[in-house]
Amino acid sequence: MQKGIKYAAFIFALILIFSPSATAIDHRELSEGEVGIISQNCSSIKVRLQRVQKDDARNRVFLGSQYETIASKLMLNLNLRLVKNGMASASLAEQQTTFMSERDRFKNDFIGYSQEFENLLNMNCKDEPEKFYRQLEVVRAKRADVDASMQRLKSIISLHYESVTDLRNNL
């Protein structure tokens, strides 16, 4: 059981270290010069956005698999072992439930973000730069939702790590 706890601690630490962060930018009106810049640089803007989309998809796959590993192989297995050994912990079980709910929220937030991002990439920024920018703001807000969910997952992982460490120290 000690080996499993050490493995769980290691995975938790990795997630905390490597979770990417995203931020939203506040809405503002575009000047005529900015509208012109978007129009003139539309193709290079789209190339950069496609790169961001590809990186985000790769990060989503990585984080999704790590979150799944934490939920199913670490939290669930630990709680099952604790119950089997007569040492059930209500706080660890609650953390598992909260983590799984937040993981589902992360998935849904990311799907919404991806859909809005795809809508952005399908827009004509050369002919409709203001509309393109408004959609970019929608994408930023959706990305902020994804980031907030990731931060909540990080907090749950940190709390669970502390609980597992306390459990280990009390054995």
Please place each PLM-identified region on the residue numbering:
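Long, amphipathic, charge-rich alpha-helical segments that form helical bundles/coiled-coils
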Residues: 92-146
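C-terminal amphipathic alpha-helix
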Residues: 27-68, 122-171
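N-terminal signal peptide c-region/cleavage motif recognized by signal peptidases
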Residues: 19-21
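Amphipathic, heptad-repeat alpha-helical segments
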Residues: 60-103
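Bacterial N-terminal signal peptides
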Residues: 9-17
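Bacterial N-terminal signal peptides that target proteins for export
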Residues: 1-8
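Amphipathic, soluble alpha-helical interaction motifs
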Residues: 73, 77, 109-112, 116, ...
